[in-house]
């Protein structure tokens, strides 16, 4: 009886370890795939840029900058991409993040539904650009924050998940 119990425990432990190893081994591959899709959709090499996703009381912002001040091409591509994103999001079109992440990010359905309640302002910044997102609608605000928190986690930016 004790031998049977030990074997069951060992088998369960081995299955748990194997599952952990498989999931852990696939994580970098999932990140690599997301980054490849992102490079294709955004039109620039993510490794040459820095993404920031910031939560604010009225919404938040998406900021992307070239890592090197002399990387004029990346800065140009960032500006083109974020200008396009601001227009797409204002129209309720979130195809770009859905393609990059291979799923519908949290908050997107509500942001699409309440698109008339949300403003997306494009702004050029040093070495890149930003999209400032704002709303006075509490439901839209919650959705914006869900969307930005998802971006922070997916892109592993280390940005605060708190409203600043």
Which role does the model predict for each range below?
Residues 5, 21-24:
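Serine/threonine-rich, low-complexity intrinsically disordered segments
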Residues 23-164:
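Intrinsically disordered, low-complexity terminal tails/loops enriched in metal-binding residues
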Residues 11-20:
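Bacterial N-terminal signal peptides
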Residues 2-12:
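Bacterial N-terminal signal peptides that target proteins for export
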């Amino acid at each position: 009886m004790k031998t049977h119990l030990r074997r069951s425990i060992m088998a369960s432990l081995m299955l748990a370890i194997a599952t952990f190893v498989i999931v852990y081994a696939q994580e970098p591959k999932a990140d690599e795939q997301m980054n490849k899709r992102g490079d294709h959709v955004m039109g620039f090499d993510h490794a040459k840029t820095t993404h920031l996703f910031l939560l604010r009381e009225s919404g938040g912002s998406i900021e992307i900058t070239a890592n090197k001040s002399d990387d004029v091409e990346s800065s140009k591509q960032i500006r083109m991409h974020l200008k396009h994103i601001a227009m797409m999001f204002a129209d309720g079109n979130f195809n770009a993040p859905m393609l990059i992440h291979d799923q519908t990010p949290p908050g997107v359905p509500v942001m699409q539904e309440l698109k008339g309640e949300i403003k997306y302002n494009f702004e050029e910044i040093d070495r890149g650009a930003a999209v400032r997102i704002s709303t006075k609608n509490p439901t839209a605000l919650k959705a914006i924050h869900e969307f930005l928190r998802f971006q922070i986690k997916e892109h592993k930016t280390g940005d605060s998940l708190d409203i600043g």
